[in-house]
Amino acid sequence: MSHVVEFTLEVKPGHYQDVVDLYSQFAHDYMAIDPHLISVHIVGEPGTGLVRGIGVFDSQEAAQEVNSDVIFATFNDAIEPLISAPPNRVILDLLHAWSR
């Protein structure tokens, strides 16, 4: 069963695009090095400063291991001064997926 990592950030005013750019680069780079990462979506709402990454992994173990990767720690260090609250990370079962 695939698993989804949802990683949500509350961005400080004036830093929305900075966080979007950092998140997009991290997702691109991580997708290139992790064969277990199936897809990534970065979504956001500029008005509220919410930025959320949704990554689909081929196993729960792969989804959990992201926290141990140096590239993830580097990303967290880069966004830390730009966010107003600690990131919220959850791992969910992927129940159904449709795409065209």
Enumerate the predicted regions with their spans.
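Glycine-rich beta-strand-turn "strand-cap" elements at beta-sheet edges
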Residues: 1-4, 8-10, 38-49, 75-100
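Short hydrophobic/aromatic beta-strand micro-patches
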Residues: 10, 54-56
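Short, surface-exposed ligand-recognition loops at beta-strand->loop->(often short) alpha-helix junctions
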Residues: 10-23
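Residues that cap or initiate secondary-structure elements
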Residues: 13-15, 61, 95
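Intrinsically disordered, low-complexity segments enriched in polar/charged residues with Gly/Pro
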Residues: 16-17, 27-30, 42-43
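Short acidic, gly/pro-rich beta-turn/loop elements at beta-sheet edges
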Residues: 17-19, 52, 63-65, 99
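An amphipathic, aromatic/His-enriched active-site/gating alpha helix that lines ligand/cofactor pockets
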Residues: 25-38, 56-90
